[in-house]
Design a protein with these regions (language model features):
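N-terminal coiled-coil initiation/transition segments in long coiled-coil scaffolds
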Residues: 12, 16-23, 29-37
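Conserved alpha-helical positions within TPR/SEL1-like repeat arrays
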Residues: 29-40, 63-74, 97-107, 130-141, ...
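TPR/TPR-like alpha-solenoid helical repeat scaffolds
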Residues: 2-4, 172-176, 197-212
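Short coil loop/turn residues that delineate tetratricopeptide repeat
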Residues: 26, 60, 94, 128, ...
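Structural signature of tandem alpha-helical TPR/SEL1-like repeats
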Residues: 5-19, 41-53, 75-87, 108-121, ...
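A generic tandem-repeat structural signature
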Residues: 58-125, 131
């Protein structure tokens, strides 16, 4: 499907949902769906308005809280994003997605221990949630806990062998652990899957292989 066709289809969906909102102004579901489609169309302010309306109608609408939090995270407002995800957890404490989001927020704030705690909680709730393992790998690498980073990365690759990001993160974790040959194999796999390998990392790995 062409980009033009996608825009036409989105415009059609938006028109239909706007009509539904006018007909059912108290429908949490319709406001939520319209917010998601606005976001997809790049109409961020409209998305914020509709998701906020959904939450106003139902302050326990966890999906609206999560999605509104994601918008604020993308905008760089991590405090608002954190507040919304924490509100979601008060409603549904075992919502793995919210724990992952809070981990991302903590990681952006350079609060690595807190990030690791949130990602770990997410993996306990949903053991095959690949995004949690991928992000946990990244946080453990930042903390220089290389053995644990490799373990987390292997979990991600086991769950989703064709995840380019999981392969890249495993390559990085193996590099810092000193397993350069296996790191190289995962770099090649990540590149094959379309991941844009950092040139500096690739060069550093080649230098290590040249001296090993």
């Amino acid at each position: 499907m062409s980009d033009t066709q996608k825009k036409i289809d989105l415009a059609t969906v938006i028109t239909e949902l706007e009509k539904a909102c006018a007909e059912k102004p108290d429908s949490v579901f319709v406001h939520h769906q319209l917010g998601l489609v606005y976001r997809q169309a790049g109409r961020v302010d409209d998305a914020v308005r509709e998701l906020s309306k959904a939450i106003e109608l139902d302050d326990q609408s966890v999906e609206s809280l999560i999605n509104l939090g994601a918008i604020f995270f993308d905008k760089g407002d991590v405090d608002r994003a954190l507040e919304l995800n924490e509100r979601a957890l008060k409603v549904t404490p075992n919502m793995a997605e919210a724990h992952v989001n809070i981990g991302l927020i903590r990681q952006r704030q350079n609060l690595i221990d807190e990030a690791i705690e949130s990602y770990t909680r997410a993996t306990q709730i949903i053991p095959d949630l690949v995004t949690a393992w991928i992000n946990l790998t990244s946080a453990l690498t930042m903390k220089e806990e290389d053995e644990k980073a490799v373990e987390a990365a292997r979990q991600a690759v086991t769950i989703e062998p064709d995840s380019a990001m999981a392969r890249n993160n495993l390559a990085v974790a193996l590099y810092f652990k000193g397993d350069f040959e296996e790191s190289k194999k995962n770099v090649e796999k990540a590149r094959e899957l379309g991941y844009p390998i950092d040139d500096r990392f690739a060069q550093a790995l080649e230098e290590k292989l040249g001296h090993s």
